Amino acid sequence: MCSNYDAVTNAERLRLYFDVDVPAGIKSQIWPLYEAPFTRRHPNKDVGDEAVPAREAMAGRFGLIPHWAGELSFGRRTYNARSETVAEKPSFRDAWKHARHCIVPAEWIYEPDWRTGKAVPTRIQRKDGKPMGIAGLWGSNRKATGEEVFSFTMLTINADDHDLFKNFHKPQDEKRMVVILREDQYDDWLGAPVGLSPDFMRQYPARLLIDAADPERGSKTRTNPTPNN
């Protein structure tokens, strides 16, 4: 399960790989409830105006905050959504039902490697140097603050048999990985109806990824965002 990653904040890389502009005020190191960019299909794409782009980047809290949640802190436990149960869980089922698909641009993600007997923060990224496009769901909430707050979650799948992700988390735990999309899937995912959503829940090949231990990541001080509620 991914609770920490580095967002794509470089304007040129966001434009080149995701065809969107970077939202203002975004930091690179992301933890639950931090604001980070996510990409969604432009809501006015189908109005017939060719000037409307296919995608837009939004700033949202990492951790889906459903419309009925009364506190932003709800997102501390909803930063990942299991693809096997996403249609049933109250936190996610509305976003899944209405196919509120998004892509989370990430330079790399972090997972704990327990093979030495203790957790070693490990950076995982694409071998070709391109950023990851992680499949997610987005939502909006007005109840918590009275103002519209956007948020998102990353979708995950089983990785017990994945040559790379099977190495992470405690030995007795189920192995999970985020759903990393190919570039040629981006628009298909953003526009897919709910009936086709499961087709995208596939493992990204281990041969196209690299990992490296980053022990300092675990010792770095981070400032937790303070939710308004």
Regions found by a protein language model. Give the residues of each.
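Short linear sequence motif anchored by a di-proline
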Residues: M1-N229
